[in-house]
Design a protein with these regions (language model features):
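N-terminal signal-anchor/initial transmembrane insertion module
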Residues: 1-77
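Intramembrane catalytic core of multi-pass membrane enzymes that act on lipidic substrates
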Residues: 69-142, 169
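Hydrophobic transmembrane alpha-helices
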Residues: 1-27, 63-67, 84-85, 146-301
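Hydrophobic alpha-helical transmembrane segments of polytopic
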Residues: 15, 19, 52-59, 92-99, ...
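Juxtamembrane helix-capping/reentrant segments at transmembrane boundaries
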Residues: 35-57, 118-127, 218, 293-300
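Short, amphipathic, aromatic/basic-enriched membrane-interface segments that mark the entry/exit
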Residues: 48, 93-95, 218-224
Length: 301
């Protein structure tokens, strides 16, 4: 227990420090995947869909292992927590797994195409997801989480937070679906064009990822509503899963911050640069891109 607690605390503090340090770097360097993927076909470029599935599955797997092992629990003695939805930590564990069921399996399998990814991206994502999944699973099965969530179902604010999680989760899926429909439409048109080229010339051009201006829902206000929706999702989750950390000093923050808030902050610091640069990319690529749209926070940024 003592060794597990020490490892948990050290990992938690480093996980709090690294994302804000890397945030300015990501404003300068483009992460080599998606619209910023290199155009070459070197051995370091991986299939976009397969690499995505592998790197994202790491998170729920490491989460389940840590949650079932309960390394920070004084009551479970190494046995799993109660695996019932009447147990608040288990309900929150289920919400975490539902998110990754969609993110790691359903969404990529429904994606008609995805740009290749440089091997550095899935390697970094695997490191992130092992850390995040393990910390989250260890926390939700801990004695501290048990105490904080005792009687949670009787508190209206708990269900407000769960509602925020659900709103963000659905928003994420809705806006991702708009992007998927753009790809599906492009793939259908591309296949028809390729068939025509085959008939006329006996060969077709190499396949390239298609991009267009997305419309609908929050796309009328921001370029990255899927990012914004994910922040709403994990803000609601953190609100119900853990106490708010102290912001009086860096030392007090590192002492009191818990994995649900670490995940939220890490997503924010990681996605802000990507959204800003992607927003600029849209404007550069499409002269008619809506000028009133912000990057990722409606009306603000």
């Amino acid at each position: 227990m003592a060794a597990a607690q020490q490892l948990y605390d050290v990992t938690r503090k480093w996980f709090a420090l690294i994302p804000p340090v890397l945030c300015p770097v990501n404003f300068i360097i483009d992460a080599p995947f998606g619209r910023f993927a290199p155009k070459d076909n070197s051995i370091f470029m991986l299939d976009g869909i397969k690499s995505w599935i592998v790197m994202e599955l790491v998170s729920p797997i490491s989460f389940c292992y840590a949650f079932l092992q309960s390394p920070l629990s004084l009551t479970h003695n190494g046995s799993p927590p109660p695996l019932s939805f009447s147990h608040p930590p288990t309900l929150l564990a289920a919400l975490f797994l539902v998110h990754y069921l969609n993110r790691a399996i359903i969404s990529p399998l429904r994606t008609p195409s995805r740009s290749k990814s440089h091997i550095s991206v899935p390697l970094a994502a695997v490191a992130f997801n092992i850390t995040n999944g393990s910390l989250m699973g260890a926390y939700l099965s801990s004695t501290a989480a048990e105490k904080f969530l005792q009687g949670a179902f009787e508190r209206p604010l708990f269900w407000v937070g769960v509602g925020l999680w659900a709103l963000g989760f659905v928003g994420n899926i809705l806006h991702d679906e708009i992007l998927l429909n753009i790809r599906r439409s492009a793939k259908a048109k591309g296949k028809a064009k390729a068939d025509e080229d085959d008939d006329n010339n006996g060969k077709s051009k190499s396949k390239q990822e298609h991009y267009a201006i997305p419309h609908g829902y929050l796309y009328e206000l921001i370029s990255y509503p899927n990012y914004f929706s994910e922040w709403v999702e994990w803000a609601g989750y953190a609100f119900v899963a853990a106490p708010l950390p102290s912001f009086t000093s860096l030392s007090s923050f590192l002492t009191t911050v818990t994995p649900p808030y670490l995940f939220l902050f890490a997503e924010f610091f990681t996605m802000i640069p990507r959204a800003y640069k992607g927003h600029k990319w849209y404007h550069a690529r499409f002269p008619d891109y809506p000028k009133q749209r912000k990057a990722v926070i409606p009306f603000l940024f």
